[in-house]
Amino acid sequence: MGAHRFMGWLLVVAFAGLLFAHPGLYSRTGLYALLVGAIGLSWLLLLVRRRQWVEFALPRELAWPVAVVLLSAGLSLLVNVDADWRALWLLGSQLLFLWVGWWLARCSSTVRLLGGAIVIGGAVAGLYAWCQFLRLDPLPTSTPFGELRIVSFFANPNHLGNFLACAMPLALAGWLEAVADRPYAGRSARFQPIVLYILIGLIYGGGLLSASRGAWVAGLVGCLIVGGGHLWEVGRGRTKLHLLPLLGLFSLLVGITALLSQRPVVRDPQKAVSMSERILSSRHIVQPYSTLDSSLTAAPGDSILVHDNAINHRYFIWQVTLDMIRSHPFAGLGYGSYQKRFARFRDAKQEEEHFKTLNWVAQSEATPYAHNEYLHIWAESGILGLLGFLALVATILRQIVLGIGKRPRQALYLWGALGVVAVMLIHSLVSYPLHLPLNGSIFWVLSGIIFGWDSGNDKLSL
């Protein structure tokens, strides 16, 4: 087994272990630390054994934003005397996955292996979500959500929704490519569109059952990017439009949506919320509460009418985070110190009307994340850290756009990669997917693959 293949299989095993980390079985965070150690040690041994430093040197376009991110994190820790340098291990693990993904991209079979693992993993997670929905889960509930929400293997329905939203664009891109290649494929490969058709149904259904509104919006945008990219390739004469298979896929997705539209996806103790009601409640993302005439209210805090408690809490967290940013806008409060600093800024708002609309859990919780990756980075690492991250993202997007123009036979998969990146960036506006062990690892490995995709790999498939 070659080095690329070995590292590829090591990542697949890591992804599988992180996916199947049911809260009732073992800790996903603990396993993540062990896997990062194993992958890091294997990577170090590979560097020492091969001794071809040029082979592992990151391109300049990728190296400089990475350097800015590292510099900003280190600077934030230096200027905050009580900061904890041990927090850097998370950033180091993310950059390790980016580096390994960049190097693995030179082996097309490894890229196929990783892409297939993500899609199959998404289908398995979706299937388990269906089992929970039908009350066929063989394992006891081990999360605070109990039987109120569908979480599959995860501890939080938003984590499930994000993972499936990432798997969906890859599965869709693979299905479109398989349909286009079917007339020219071998006998066994002709069944690939049917297999992917089933996998897409499981992923899509599981995503709906997660009832994660942020993941729904992000996943929809990711799929629209892949669909729009397919039409773009058709317009340029690079592929053909196969209407009958597309109609079949559209019918499948509509059928699943109709099946679940009136079924409860949030079993609130006071009221079960159907999927259609959950979709309609997405409007509260832009208006979680209304301000009433305080002269007509009887008690403090009654001057605000809350439409959605969860989103209302997010808005409060963002307000606290903005206060944290204002206090240290340039160097930040210290990488990895968000939760440690949050309580002081939260308590400073105790007399404000918005604070009084929160339930007692939200009023006392020291949340570890800002539920917005961009604000979180700015609060911890300062403006330099945010600019470094945005530069890294811009470089990734630029690489995808250049690849779509230069590599016609890889274009659909690059559209799929763009869809996944879009899912993560959009969901990062209202959640913290980059901090999740499995979801974040997939993003960084994929980002590295996008950079390292060799122009000689003209044929890639899931």
Can you say where each PLM-predicted feature lies in the sequence?
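Membrane-embedded alpha-helical segments of multi-pass membrane proteins
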Residues: 30-46, 88-98, 160-168, 217-224, ...
